[in-house]
């Protein structure tokens, strides 16, 4: 690692849900961008081998720093590939994005880590510990399945946040994610803490009504009730739902297609403001926990 700068007290946040398609990669993009714009040096690590975060960060093609030999049959990870973090002696050089964030990306081949002896997860933890001294925040976009890669992301993290949609499979993914977090906390990382859940793509019927009294559609309201039940069963209350991000279909589709955050593409849009508020809430919660 050739980054030379004063030591920082880096905080690692893993973004995870045991269900794909919950806007995990885009929200990782939004939160990390907002952290950087707020003056916090931020590193993004894509640990979902579907590479959604990586592909939207580099919509014009995969950089050679992530995949050195893309046209050959053999896998040749570059120095900015997440794969390298699972080894104790590899060169790691994050890509510096135009907005100031640093980025370590992935490709499908990261899945190969799941067939290695599971002690590689501790090499990963050591490499992330070394990176923490260079950053204020490290945002890890985790994968939605219990595996070496998923466990590694959690044993290296300080905090977990869980995005979800208001529908059955997504809230069930929240329940599984919290169960896995508690298992990993008990066996590997007792310092791991749950910051909260945030609802993505919320379709609001009436902003003037209370959460369970008509703000959302009847189906979404029932799913929210069940999400609250899941939290209660895990020992948490409704305050752990940190944000309800409104769904603006055209803005969302166009921003994602262009590889932009909402703040870059439509800074006055409701989702841009809500992700900014969520980011500030995360900072406040972490600072409060550190003071405590």
Kindly give the residue locations of the regions a language model identified.
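P-loop NTP-binding core
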Residues: 1-292
